[in-house]
Amino acid sequence: MLLKSPPAWPAVSRGLPRARLVCPSRPPTLRLRRLRAAAALSEPPTFAGRYGKWTLTDNDRAEVLAYRAALNLLAFSFDAAAAAALLGDETTQQQVLNVASVGGVVGLGAALFLVRSAKRRGARTELLSHLVQVHMYVTPIKRFMQALWLAGTVGCVALAFTNADMPVATYVASHPQAVWLIGPVFAALTGLSFKEGACYGTPESVALFFAVPALLLGKLAGAPDDVEKLLLVVVALLLSVFALRKWTQPLQADIGDKSIFDFMALPPDEQQRREVELEKLERGF
């Protein structure tokens, strides 16, 4: 019986490792899956909203980071002013208080205001102006908070020009009735604290909602100096915790449900139609 010799390798394969011939390459489907996974990672995250899905864009991220940075500027400025008022001498107070006051007012204003660039829709252009990342769905409340901040800022500027020989904070400390001029700024901060506390339930936001008015009312009512100092320290600490903890929250938390904003931008007839469709879906029709 003759033994057959094993078949020779093709000429093109001579000199190549046998394992390379057995498994020439990874299956194309594996590479395709990896490409799809990489593409999915590069796409903006999608969230389910009340009126449909929405995505977190780069502009959204930039706005949230700007909002949180503005809150930290507000907190740092208030802390610096409180430290100068409680621990600094007259020279330090002259150097720090007005600068810190400007920083605090600017920080709160930056957290409340944003004028977005014009968006062209068809043949018309409309300018969208609203609160920044304080994404509140009731526009009159937004405008009211803006108006409070603006009124308090005007009061601060008026005090600075009429009493140029001393910082605004020093003048208010010795003239309690001046609280009525700067108070609207703190009222806007109180409203912001209420929004944050209602949305996220953070204890420092809830505490700020009560501590800030208590500080102003204590000054108006002529509270003892020790009580005023204690309230000042409490507000400074709460603001610091509030501003720093914002960095630990998910970015989409400060955006809100973008599908609601898109819905509110629709004409009333379209809003009603969408509501009817949503109600049918919820009922299973």
Enumerate the language-model features and the residues they cover:
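Structural signature of hydrophobic alpha-helical transmembrane segments
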Residues: 93-105, 124, 170-183
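Small-residue-rich segments of transmembrane alpha-helices in multi-pass membrane proteins
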Residues: 149-158, 206-219, 262-270
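Cytoplasmic-side transmembrane-helix entry/capping segments in multi-pass membrane proteins
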Residues: 101, 121-124, 139-152, 175-179, ...
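The first (N-terminal) embedded transmembrane alpha-helix
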Residues: 64-84
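C-terminal ends of transmembrane helices
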Residues: 110-122, 127-139, 189-199
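Alpha-helical membrane segments in multi-pass integral membrane proteins
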Residues: 180-186, 201-218, 230-241
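Short, highly charged, low-complexity non-transmembrane loops/tails of multi-pass membrane proteins
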Residues: 252-284
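N-terminal chloroplast transit peptides
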Residues: 1-32, 37-40
